Amino acid sequence: MLPSQSPAIFTVSRLNQTVRLLLEHEMGQVWISGEISNFTQPASGHWYFTLKDDTAQVRCAMFRNSNRRVTFRPQHGQQVLVRANITLYEPRGDYQIIVESMQPAGEGLLQQKYEQLKAKLQAECLFDQQYKKPLPSPAHCVGVITSKTGAALHDILHVLKRRDPSLPVIIYPTSVQGDDAPGQIVRAIELANQRNECDVLIVGRGGGSLEDLWSFNDERVARAIFASRIPVVSAVGHETDVTIADFVADLRAPTPSAAAEVVSRNQQELLRQVQSARQRLEMAMDYYLANRTRRFTQIHHRLQQQHPQLRLARQQTMLERLQKRMSFALENQLKRAGQQQQRLTQRLNQQNPQPKIHRTQTRIQQLEYRLAEILRAQLSATRERFGNAVTHLEAVSPLSTLARGYSVTTATDGNVLKKVKQVKTGEMLTTRLEDGWIESEVKNIQPVKKSRKKVH
């Protein structure tokens, strides 16, 4: 039996149009976070890229009138947050995202602020080596600016007590995390300079995320460190954590414990150095006395050996020895020269060059033939690949669509016209053809009523 009502039959164009309308009307604008990849910017100024996460990706476009409001240059691998409309490109049936706005997501925004401040302060020469103050050697009093409850303070005090128990330490407690932390750190630095009790300051905290360490990327903290008359050692986080404070400080220590090592004297090491110096001095004195005694003995012996009869006897013996060596060397030289002449004569007779020349010429001819064959084959393959690539590029080029007689019309706001209700009489329109643009004014609007076929 036939069903009472046949299912609706869609053309491909109608199907794509229906899906596009469903996406645009049902979804509306959405916020999407993801990682940028395959970013390109053709001559039109539009941006084309892919947003992806661990399991999926979607193609995106951001037109020139929208991307000119973005305050940063998107980079491959950057995490971003976009506000976009979901649509379908009807000619190809491709689902894509039209991005209206973009901003860095999460730590990407913090990293961007970090780089901007770093570039700004570097341009003002706050990082230059010429402004770095030398640390006192030795330090007579150490100031520590950090949290009074943090592990960093415990580590610093532990190292100072172990290395230099007599070194005075003054603690300027401050918050190192949160919105109020930068202001407190600045006030602590200024207070230390006003009281002028210390000759070196340690400013830092323990490790954490980029957000946790952000107080030490604050411009106010950086300028306070730069303005400090007392030398500042930065000790923020772990060795891999680098903050703006590290660049401005007079010295950067990889950890708070390392900062304490830098500013303190190791008393045990000093004692070992004194003992070592004493031992070296004693050894030097012993060596000097032994050397003087040995020198005196040598001079005394040389005086005894310089008798004229002894000198004549030694010279006579040496002359006879040299005569024997000269005769023996001359005989050996003549013998070796004769043997060498015989070997050269034999080698010359054996090394007739004609056979070798013939073999080399034959080999060269074979290689020339093989090289010509390889070059012809590679040239043919390259021409074939180039032809295929040109054909493929021409097939997928958007300009090919325009060349077949199609055009794209946009309103004054840059939106592509799809229906007559998007325009009004008197508005100016821009039409893109294969070879250029046409600006026109709407004189008359005539909607076309679509006829519906009754389905039996």
Curated annotation (Swiss-Prot):
EC number(s) given by UniProt: 3.1.11.6
GO MF entries: exodeoxyribonuclease VII activity; nucleic acid binding
Entry-linked HAMAP family: Exonuc_7_L (MF_00378)
Reactions catalysed according to its record: Exonucleolytic cleavage in either 5'- to 3'- or 3'- to 5'-direction to yield nucleoside 5'-phosphates
Domain of life where this protein originates: Bacteria
Assembly notes: Heterooligomer composed of large and small subunits.
Protein name per the record: Exodeoxyribonuclease 7 large subunit
One Gene Ontology CC term in the entry: cytoplasm
Enzyme class: hydrolase
NCBIfam families the UniProt entry points to: xseA
Organism name: Shigella flexneri
Keywords: Cytoplasm, Exonuclease, Hydrolase, Nuclease
